[in-house]
């Protein structure tokens, strides 16, 4: 059996290794939850054997040594970490320790904040002017990132207002909103650059660039949460008061900071934030709970690496470790070959996960993934679980290479990867059963032709029995033929036939979207329909003419042009029209002639609406001369935010785009 000393040495060595990967290399190998577990194990052993605690134990310090590439800044006041709790019982025990240690009947109130998942920084202002900025580093010495911090627009270079201290060190978190993270990775995949595993890594990598011009291109932002050095001035005597003073001086503070009068209110805040977490637009991994009174904070003091007056109440882990048992390849409706990791099932954020996307061959190469590897799985909100990284230090000896197919796993056709694209595709087209199934499922979906009752299992059977080859074949189905399918009685079969008949009456935009042209989503389909008005005009359009449609670039224009240039596609369209698919004659809208607050504006809808469906809202906006887009960009004029608006709202706020709610939208629609 291992001695206690040997266990402590191994735990400290392991933790130091992972601290170095996390804080210095920005390349964590294990989930935060696993690091926390190892730290708890070490702390418990040291508590039982205090005589074995060493000054350099990870429990006695914060972080790791700074990179040599940056000059160093010594923190005048150490930047400490926080202790963690993971359940209500542990928080209530912390609450009791605070009450007992104060030894008075004085009421304790709590200032609660979001625990942002970014990079802790210290920013020094002298006479209100930003003079330096540093990372946390090892808590005593950090890296000088002044030039990079100056590029972050959320951080003021000069404070404004009155009574600004002569020297004020503000502490906070630099982080990357989800929309910005997705854009960085999207660009990286397109250009062959570095793809980041999560927003925290992307924020750290962006902030620690040796070239500030690169940092300036990254949409980093910042919230402050504390103070270090304070000279030649005064601050309020409560933590919340200080944050509000920071805000008055122009420093960004989260609008979710909340004062709680009791432990029960703290728990209610925790659960409210946990519920809202998927729609915040940026990553958090818990809430931070601080004694609000500065006098009480001073009474409580510090332990070696953390204050006694604050704690991080962490959410259930969104990352876990498991093993890759196999890698299979799925074929989508456009022929895209997507590798999927088959995992040893593991619970992540309350959900049992057994599969995770690997995106493409480049991602497998970037990860260095082999079948049999131990990997970190991440699941955030409704995002499909993905492999974040491989735990190389625990790679088994019997792992196998992942071999990307050269032929379609479904139909055997050649797999082709166009130069400059990350995705490999099956060249089989509609002879490929997988593409045929997915194309038909898309065609009948609610936002396309909206064929009620035509579910995935029915489509699967229709393709497997060779009843249907193209979308036009759907409209030739009879109740008798449908009755031969599993779980399909005469009544259900007739209902499907009736739904197909009803679906023949559609709109030009829906019809275009249903065709499944590559990279033509609802918004693009609506734009094409509004611009060209008729199918004949669209079919005849050149690539140059197609690019005149708002938000249609060379890539989408080429996909549309190539689709209509293909004779088999034109034949399917002719068959659909012959089967009776039709839509109203176009109403040509000239935005300049419409007297409407939306005329000529590019509008984005986000979140859920309570008074009308999103489709109805889109249709009404288009009638009033708006161009409804699917994503927020610098070209967006207005964002309409419903309930639970997420990353699109965050991006709009980041870009300074006008935002209105559903009530204001309805008022303007009525005007």
UniProtKB/Swiss-Prot annotation:
Domain called BRCT: residue spans: 593-671
Catalytic residues identified in the record: 115 (n6-amp-lysine intermediate)
Record family assignment: Belongs to the NAD-dependent DNA ligase family. LigA subfamily.
GO terms, biological process: DNA repair; DNA replication
Source species taxonomy: Bacteria, Pseudomonadati, Pseudomonadota, Gammaproteobacteria, Enterobacterales
Binding annotation for Zn(2+): 408, 411, 426, 432
Positions annotated to bind NAD(+): 32-36, 81-82, 113, 136, 173, 290, 314
EC number assigned by the record: 6.5.1.2
Protein name as annotated: DNA ligase
GO cellular component: cytosol
Keywords: DNA damage, DNA repair, DNA replication, Ligase, Magnesium, Manganese, Metal-binding, NAD, Zinc
Cofactor (UniProt): Mg(2+); Mn(2+)
UniProt cross-references to NCBIfam families, sorted A to Z: dnlj (TIGR00575), PRK07956.1 (NF005932)
